Amino acid sequence: MGLGARGAWAALLLGTLQVLALLGAAHESAAMAASANIENSGLPHNSSANSTETLQHVPSDHTNETSNSTVKPPTSVASDSSNTTVTTMKPTAASNTTTPGMVSTNMTSTTLKSTPKTTSVSQNTSQISTSTMTVTHNSSVTSAASSVTITTTMHSEAKKGSKFDTGSFVGGIVLTLGVLSILYIGCKMYYSRRGIRYRTIDEHDAII
């Protein structure tokens, strides 16, 4: 490869690097302007009277990963309790910035290349980077068991006297006679067959 080709490749590489640098600077300026607007809109609502400011510098290449793949927003977070924490971050490169409200702003990004400046404001001389407030509601459930008494009144007709049922009496007699007649006929048929068998055996013996 000649010197001319190498020079062309070097010039192309330098031009690419310059273009990337210009794009990065433009993106950085846009992100800084957006963060400045967010600070101007958020900080007046979340200031306190007697506050101490503590500056904390974070390294430039910083990646924030949460369970929902979200990065802590460059806004000010304030709570109503005595401990007030305000966190301000100035990123240089960000993407997909969503500002749902004045108090909390979620900025989704994969990698942040920034030089954030964290300001912690505390009233009770306690510096907190992330404040978590847990509210526990203790509810007691009282179940009242009500007893319901149902009184059922059954009016039964008083039996004046036992009446003689002629139909059931006659039916019982007919049923008894029917069973006896069936037994009689069965026994008679059994004995008649038995007598025929004995008689045939006697005749056979007599013939022999």
UniProtKB/Swiss-Prot annotation:
Membrane-crossing segments per the record: 167-187
Extracellular side stretches: 27-166
Signal sequence, renumbered to the chain: 1-26
All ranges on the Cytoplasmic side of the membrane: 188-208
Tissue expression notes: Ubiquitous. Not expressed in ovary. Expressed in keratinocytes.
Main location (coarse class): membrane
Cell wall biogenesis/degradation found in the keyword field: no
Glycosylation positions in this chain: N46, N50, N64, N68, N83, N96, N106, N124, N138
One of the record's GO cellular component terms: cytoplasmic vesicle
Compartments where located: Membrane
Residue ranges of the region described as Disordered: 42-125
Biased composition (Low complexity): 108-122
Keyword line: Glycoprotein, Membrane, Receptor, Signal, Transmembrane, Transmembrane helix
Bias kind Polar residues: ranges: 42-57, 65-107
Membrane topology: Single-pass type I membrane protein
InterPro entries, alphabetized: CD164_MGC24
GO MF annotation: an example: signaling receptor activity
Keyword Zinc-finger set for record: no
Biological role: Implicated in oncotic cell death, characterized by cell swelling, organelle swelling, vacuolization and increased membrane permeability.
Family per similarity comment: Belongs to the CD164 family.
Annotated protein name in UniProt: Porimin
Species this chain originates from: Homo sapiens
UniProt gene name: TMEM123
